[in-house]
């Protein structure tokens, strides 16, 4: 049964023509709405954001909207009207709750495409739905490292590759996850061709050595993580030293703890990386996820 609440944006961009509505309309999520010639479908030419919604609260809404604008800028697309997108997210959550009741965890997905080729009119929509049960993943995951095929400085040398934009073109990321499954793992840490740890297909990497907590720097063509920022707030408040660095992948094996963190799954401690077992501090992992799930902004 389709439980998603769908809102179609009538004014997805600041350049969109004025409308008589709030910039969006609710639609039947079980019916087709996107033109089959839309470049988001035919070329994967667009971007998206996925926002965790806990007890009715969209988490890190403003950072997600800022990242939406950043993706548009990198892709030379019209600037999203974040006032409309914000209202659409909140309206989608409210409508979903009215129909299905208040649920502990939902997600809101925001999608904007370049639209039908030649029209210059972007397409946008938001849908809100229940997600997977990530209880097991929050207790621990097995991970493999895979070569991404790019140097760590690819965003500088080759900006047309759109590293750092949250594009709709996730075929390679999904292929990486299938490769991980073939190797008996749950997820992936991408490594640059010159040996630096980068990110997961849908997550950021957190590395702890003693009182020091690091994440790969975003100047390596990786997404600035909204959940990662909250993880740093958690560790900062507990006296840890946090930093963004270029982290050689061969240093990961010496870490005291590793996590993959993302908006909906939250924080997943790594129990095994490339065959090496890691001891998980279950109390710390639970405390971190409790903190992340308690965010109301």
Region locations from a protein language model:
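Helix-start/capping segments and mature chain N-termini
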Residues: 1-80, 87-91, 118-297
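Short, acidic/charged, Gly/Pro-enriched secondary-structure junctions
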Residues: 12, 86-115, 129
